[in-house]
Amino acid sequence: MATGTLPDAGQILNSLINSILLVDDDLAVHYANPAAQQLLAQSSRKLFGTPLPELLSYFSLNIGLMQESLAAGQGFTDNEVTLVIDGRSHILSLTAQRLPEGYILLEMAPMDNQRRLSQEQLQHAQQIAARDLVRGLAHEIKNPLGGLRGAAQLLSKALPDPALMEYTKVIIEQADRLRNLVDRLLGPQHPGMHVTESIHKVAERVVKLVSMELPDNVKLVRDYDPSLPELPHDPDQIEQVLLNIVRNALQALGPEGGEITLRTRTAFQLTLHGVRYRLAARIDVEDNGPGIPSHLQDTLFYPMVSGREGGTGLGLSIARSLIDQHSGKIEFTSWPGHTEFSVYLPIRK
């Protein structure tokens, strides 16, 4: 049984593993416990008086909604807040409470890794279900399309009037266009031919192809790890994946231009599809464009989801399917001024 003098509030706050901040209505910091100082990579003295958003490259918190809740005398909780500090992304659970003295108490706790993994697995399962549904519909569409095209060809041969044949020509062309779309919806149907070689060969082919499309105000940077081991993969399929991601980055930069970085690294002790690998390859495509809109991020790998006008929304869905066939994974982080897609491919168990 504990005896003696109880610790004061400051001692308690200083011993917590969660980050605790006291801020005013402008979110200027008036107190930060050691955990918060470590998270924000600043001393208490440097933090004092600085508005929290100025300390971060990106802060996903809906500050207006939080302030509305606090003004109404209610607490506020956001179970998934993204902070970017010195280029590193942190996903946290945040709670806010107004104190009688007028300060706002912010408590930030790292999202539990198991919970985050469960969310990723659930999201991946939903994406697979959506992809399977679209493929099933595509199969149902493809069969009558063949009959429609065949009937139009027969009709074209039977029509004596060339003017009428123009209509059958339109039917055939549009049927072919729909068939091409359906084939893309169906995606890869069979595993590719795997070879064991350096992934940098694929990366260089992608660089060569994209370099012909680069405007003068876009810089393509290569940052390869020369020690990355060879790995089994289908070069054509991985080229398709990387080419799609790099072209998406190029389109995201828009007329303002910017920089795209193609990076390779070795990842250690990584779990992919329930299997633990001692070594894996990580291929990053990073750009400094405007970022992916937040309302698209949860569904970005779903078929028919696109943030670009005129886009089909199939490229990333097919890319994930191809990476799944390699027992790998593809993920991304994005905020204004930074988007990074990372492809992981297994090397050695």
Curated annotation (Swiss-Prot):
One of its GO terms (molecular function) is ATP binding. Autophosphorylated. ATP binds at K329. One of its GO terms (biological process) is regulation of DNA-templated transcription. It comes from Klebsiella oxytoca. The modification Phosphohistidine is found at H139. It comes from the Bacteria. Its main location: cytoplasm. GO terms for cellular component: cytoplasm. Keywords: ATP-binding, Cytoplasm, Hydrolase, Kinase, Nitrogen fixation, Nucleotide-binding, Phosphoprotein, Transferase, Two-component regulatory system. Residues 136-349 form the Histidine kinase domain. Member of the two-component regulatory system NtrB/NtrC, which controls expression of the nitrogen-regulated (ntr) genes in response to nitrogen limitation. Under conditions of nitrogen limitation, NtrB autophosphorylates and transfers the phosphoryl group to NtrC. In the presence of nitrogen, acts as a phosphatase that dephosphorylates and inactivates NtrC. This is Sensory histidine kinase/phosphatase NtrB. It catalyses: ATP + protein L-histidine = ADP + protein N-phospho-L-histidine. Its EC number is 2.7.13.3, 3.1.3.-. Disulfide bonds: none annotated. It is found in: Cytoplasm. The gene is ntrB. Residues 5-78 form the PAS domain. The lineage of its organism: Bacteria, Pseudomonadati, Pseudomonadota, Gammaproteobacteria, Enterobacterales.
